[in-house]
Amino acid sequence: MRMTWNFHQYYTNRNDGLMGKLVLTDEEKNNLKALRKIIRLRTRDVFEEAKGIAKAVKKSALTFEIIQEKVSTTQIKHLSDSEQREVAKLIYEMDDDARDEFLGLTPRFWTQGSFQYDTLNRPFQPGQEMDIDDGTYMPMPIFESEPKIGHSLLILLVDASLKSLVAENHGWKFEAKQTCGRIKIEAEKTHIDVPMYAIPKDEFQKKQIALEANRSFVKGAIFESYVADSITDDSETYELDSENVNLALREGDRKWINSDPKIVEDWFNDSCIRIGKHLRKVCRFMKAWRDAQWDVGGPSSISLMAATVNILDSVAHDASDLGETMKIIAKHLPSEFARGVESPDSTDEKPLFPPSYKHGPREMDIMSKLERLPEILSSAESADSKSEALKKINMAFGNRVTNSELIVLAKALPAFAQEPSSASKPEKISSTMVSG
């Protein structure tokens, strides 16, 4: 008689199972939060230093040379000489309106990406890193062309914040990316990306007034303002018109592009409500598969998440048996990627993964490994022993799990041990960012 193995505990056991190997420890989470706080505090301080210089210029007309000298005594000194001159020049040349806007500017912060979605996995291979994306948000008047406060000044001040911390911490490195500044800490297998956004000041202030009125009821945290070391935050109060959230670009003619990360966050939260809490787990497992198959590269996390949501929205599955659910996902992923994976954010100009007629070597490599995944899972399911089953399934997810006792003989169960998750039509993402 042919044996069939059940892998639910292999996937879900919080100690020895795959889930237990992927979830960050409390220490790792706290280290990321501490790093985030250090950067936020330094960013706030650098902006206060720059505003102090601008205030001195307003009070008594200072020469360019004096402004340069003042810049060199702040954390901005960690920029290059030419960048310091540029900061001094931009402050010196501000007109009265721009200076007043700058003096009233206080950066806000909002974490985005896998840390926020609770799908961040521990690194597996050398070179892979834990990452946290923490946006710096600048409440500014809505602009049609260029804002009063120059794009270059804002970028340079955020860079100065990061570079000053790099100068103070051995082993930290700064990297300039097109859409963010990055601090990389190789010894801790960690990096933090700091993108910068402009958001509409008037709308933000109205929301903040509402937040202040309800401060006693606020528990969660999305936007966080370190004013007197306080944290203010509320996912609904800080909903903003996505059309007016603009991401700063470092290079090129386009200085800003419309991009609101909360669209994707809301989409994923809504998907978890609609499909079930197991969605976060299977998305973690697919990212674990990716990290085991490629030391760098492979399909993006968001493309795996979007394809997985599409599958679980349309195929009935048993949330109480994630081994079977993963087989369903693996079976349908190749066709999802072959037709192309669209972004849940309608403002994205490109698909997350192109359709098959546009595939090059990279895409063909990804398709080949996607097509191999269901074969691996099927082979593991029909292995001759637990140890052989473990060896085979680890071909997909790496040798993270070593306890073969988590793999048990499949019992003769009805088609579904509980009512299957209903397959509903995927919901259209609202551009107005309704929180899930």
Swiss-Prot record:
Belongs to the CD-NTase family. A01 subfamily. The gene is dncV. Its EC number is 2.7.7.-. GTP binds at residues 112-117, 287, 301, 348. Changing residue 257 to R: No effect on enzyme activity. Mg(2+) binds at residues 131, 133, 193. GO terms for biological process: cyclic nucleotide biosynthetic process; defense response to virus; negative regulation of chemotaxis. Changing residue 108 to W: Abolishes enzyme activity. Keywords: Antiviral defense, ATP-binding, GTP-binding, Isopeptide bond, Magnesium, Metal-binding, Nucleotide metabolism, Nucleotide-binding, Nucleotidyltransferase, Transferase, Virulence. It is an enzyme of class 2 (transferase). It comes from Vibrio cholerae serotype O1 (strain ATCC 39315 / El Tor Inaba N16961). ATP binds at residues 182, 259. Residues 419-436 have a biased composition (Polar residues). Pfam families: DncV-like_NTFase (PF21654), DncV_C (PF21713). This is Cyclic GMP-AMP synthase. Changing residue 435 to E: DncV-GFP fusion cleaved by Cap3.
